[in-house]
Amino acid sequence: MSRTWIRNPLAIFTANGLDAAGGLVVEDGRIVELLGAGQQPAQPCASQFDASRHVVLPGLVNTHHHFYQTLTRAWAPVVNQPLFPWLKTLYPVWARLTPEKLELATKVALAELLLSGCTTAADHHYLFPGGLEQAIDVQAGVVEELGMRAMLTRGSMSLGEKDGGLPPQQTVQEAETILADSERLIARYHQRGDGARVQIALAPCSPFSVTPEIMRASAEVAARHDVRLHTHLAETLDEEDFCLQRFGLRTVDYLDSVGWLGPRTWLAHGIHFNAEEIRRLGEAGTGICHCPSSNMRLASGICPTVELEAAGAPIGLGVDGSASNDASNMILEARQALYLQRLRYGAERITPELALGWATRGSARLLGRSDIGELAPGKQADLALFKLDELRFSGSHDPLSALLLCAADRADRVMVGGAWRVVDGAVEGLDLAALIARHRAAASALIAG
């Protein structure tokens, strides 16, 4: 692949403090050189891209999502419900999911993410009703088609209503089925090393939808194959009450009891922790995905990011949903994180750079990846470029701050592994209008039953 100079950006955020005011050089899918202001590339470049009207970021990394939920956005019966009633109302609808509907939902979620500057996305898929046993295979095909990177987690629910869990019986699976499929997916799809496009993690859904046995067994499989672990934890006080009543343990004690407290694990939400639990999470190096939009939408609470980071727990961001956000937009999620965390910690402490760092380098750490999430020689050439020429940016002065403060919501250019996947604000090779029409029809059919 020829060398390309992304030249003289309006502003650039490297996520590591390195100077790249003069741009960067891409070759063979990687960044090979950062340039200071006025510097020229060390070797000739076959092509140049004038970035003088663009703010350049590392490709954003989304560390918690449920792609299938794009089919149930803004559904009236759940608009004003908190988490547990929200789930109980939606479970029967989601149980009607089919491979065709999942493919459309996944494509919509990934296209929306890509257009928002996201190049890597983790999805937590835990629904495998009859006929949808190959759900992760469906998702892997869409990831390849759109040319993104993904951490596809093999979620699971094994604790149904009849045994004291939250989900209805038609949405749960036996432990043997879950573990066999986990092994199959790791063998078939999990790529290792720099530049991996698809990786697999194991993700029993939550304390109120899986048994301790499947948590322990999943941890053993993950350790044996050196893959990561993911689950929802400490999202609501209802969940905390469930753990106390069923297990006699608070959430972090429960996590520890099933062998999950460690650096292999990242958790979605992580809101309701006391000081001792924060200390233990930090010492273990367990990561936390902050989902500000979802947490506000469901009135769940505010993640204690500052204390968690100070204790040693990595922090990343996730859009969650898309029935609890209800968008799949990573640059807007960084804005939400900025504002929600300022509400807790004050304006001086939570800066745009901190929020963007969570959305890039921090999120990459949650996924165990050191090759993405920042701009430096040797890193993957995953880039998000935003123009500031819309009405909302008129009168802004600091380009990097303007991305979040003025609510940027769509990238002009996005590069994944050295290849442009978004050009002039459109996904390459994707008929978006046709996709929207098919997706809307599928969403209506799902609700209608």
Curated annotation (Swiss-Prot):
CDD domains: ATZ_TRZ_like (cd01298). Binds 1 zinc ion per subunit. It catalyses: 8-oxoguanine + H2O + H(+) = urate + NH4(+). The keyword Cell membrane does not apply. Keywords: Hydrolase, Metal-binding, Zinc. Its cofactor is Zn(2+). Pfam families: Amidohydro_1. It comes from the Bacteria. Pathway: Purine metabolism. InterPro entries: Amidohydro-rel, Metal-dep_hydrolase_composite, Metal_Hydrolase, MTA/SAH_deaminase. Belongs to the metallo-dependent hydrolases superfamily. ATZ/TRZ family. Homodimer. This is 8-oxoguanine deaminase.
